[in-house]
């Protein structure tokens, strides 16, 4: 009986790993900014003076940022452990990133150039990484651990 050891993370898998690590860093920084803003007494006074819908939107945005950070952290750990579920969850994570980029493009009061650039980077990464994760024999040979 022969057992094959899983391949190491390398080759073209370093690109998706780098994208994941940069996303983890950016979501961590976003959470730090949210926390810094929410820890200020002036923020509570300002939010208290806003409409209830604005307060709810702030809360939903903060909870979404926490959920995305947690999911990105979990996926990064699973990526390094070469778990079998990584390709499926990486694709789900990319689709969530596309949805958030489309939301930012459509609804945020951000300059169009910044929103378009964020949307294009996310769409390009998704268009390149999803077929690679679905069809690559290297991906199938790397992510084999339960």
From Swiss-Prot:
It comes from the Bacteria. Residues 1-12, 81-89, 134-146 are cytoplasmic. The keyword Signal does not apply. Its main location: membrane. The chain crosses the membrane at residues 13-33, 60-80, 90-110, 113-133. It holds the Pfam family DUF2569. It is a multi-pass membrane protein. InterPro entries: DUF2569. Coiled coil: none annotated. Residues 34-59, 111-112 are periplasmic. Keywords: Cell inner membrane, Cell membrane, Membrane, Transmembrane, Transmembrane helix. GO terms for cellular component: plasma membrane. It is found in: Cell inner membrane. To Synechocystis PCC 6803 sll0481. This is Inner membrane protein YdgK. It comes from Escherichia coli (strain K12). The lineage of its organism: Bacteria, Pseudomonadati, Pseudomonadota, Gammaproteobacteria, Enterobacterales.
